[in-house]
């Protein structure tokens, strides 16, 4: 059997699926918005709209830039899905708050260690 004649079907990318159009074999957006990430893309689509996503992706000239941009678009969409009031800013606030709590906990542990060392030195 001639391997070159075998048609490998891939699912249409999330962008083409959202636009209800046929996804061409050399779709510019398939590497960045594969079918497996459809849910993430839908979140981004609700936030930015497909036409704005296309404009942003076309503005990024290099593959590395497009890769980072697509990742950012998907993350921002998910952030707004999880926190509709604050989006990515809310996630950053939450992480900063968690860091502050961990710092307080770490300082408490350091203080306990200091006290235990002093007790141990007094016993010797």
UniProtKB/Swiss-Prot annotation:
UniProt protein name: LOB domain-containing protein 9
Annotated ranges, domain LOB: 11-113
Database matches in PROSITE patterns: LOB (PS50891)
Transmembrane segments: none
One Pfam family, short name: LOB
Family to which this protein belongs: Belongs to the LOB domain-containing protein family.
InterPro entries: LOB
């Amino acid at each position: 059997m001639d391997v070159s004649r075998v048609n490998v079907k891939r699912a249409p990318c999330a962008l083409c699926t959202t636009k209800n159009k046929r996804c061409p074999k050399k779709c510019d957006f398939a590497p960045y918005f594969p079918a497996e990430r459809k849910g993430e893309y839908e979140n981004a689509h609700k936030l930015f709209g497909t036409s704005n996503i296309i404009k942003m992706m076309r503005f990024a000239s290099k593959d590395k830039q497009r890769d980072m941009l697509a990742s950012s678009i998907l993350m921002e969409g998910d952030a707004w899905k999880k926190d509709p009031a604050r989006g990515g800013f809310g996630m950053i606030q939450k992480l900063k708050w968690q860091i502050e709590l961990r710092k307080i906990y770490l300082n408490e542990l350091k203080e306990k260690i200091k006290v235990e060392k002093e007790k141990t030195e007094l016993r010797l």
